[in-house]
Amino acid sequence: MELQVVGANALTVSETTFGREFNEALIHQVVVAYAAGARQGSRAQKTRAEVSGSGKKPWRQKGTGRARSGDIKSPIWRSGGVTFAAKPQDHSQKVNKKMYRGAIKSILSELVRQDRLIVVEKFEVEAPKTKVLVQKLKELALEDVLIITASLDENLFLAARNLYKVDVRDVQGIDPVSLIAFDKVVVTVDAVKQIEEMLA
């Protein structure tokens, strides 16, 4: 199959990478796993066994008129332990390489079908200036956009850093979540070739 390149000849690409069927279930599973892996999972509370303090009975069982009490670390006391204390947890989910690559291929194929994948010969800015990039994006009628280059261009990265809904990644930095988060995806010809090699 062929992808149209802005201002140049069409680029022949692999059908298996850019012409796959849309697999919503696979994409959902991979995106959920990706988001789960980003969770910190470090919350921690203390049970009554872990709270610092004496284990001595505060006052005798009977005769004081007060409610009976056996431990100042009781969960019903102020500063006591937590009944079902939260503990650090690993939320990560296992995703096979084949599934992960399949999800990215499926997303790229859907972007092509929806005309949301724009292939350009190259995408550069002369200086790390936001206004230079804004002008370039205006010329291409782009606002909400992910720009993927073969290698990370520092000028382009710095120019895009302060722009809302504009992100710059190299091929190694793409993931399913970023691919579906933007309205349009701009990819350079060299990046397309690298993506094909990476997902082969």
Swiss-Prot record:
Keywords, alphabetical: Ribonucleoprotein, Ribosomal protein, RNA-binding, rRNA-binding
Record-given protein name: Large ribosomal subunit protein uL4
Species, as recorded: Pasteurella multocida (strain Pm70)
GO biological process, one term: translation
Subunit structure: Part of the 50S ribosomal subunit.
Family per record: Belongs to the universal ribosomal protein uL4 family.
Region (Disordered): 43-71
GO molecular function terms attached to this record: rRNA binding; structural constituent of ribosome
Protein function: One of the primary rRNA binding proteins, this protein initially binds near the 5'-end of the 23S rRNA. It is important during the early stages of 50S assembly. It makes multiple contacts with different domains of the 23S rRNA in the assembled 50S subunit and ribosome.
GO cellular component: ribonucleoprotein complex; ribosome
Designated gene of the protein: rplD
Classification of source organism: Bacteria, Pseudomonadati, Pseudomonadota, Gammaproteobacteria, Pasteurellales
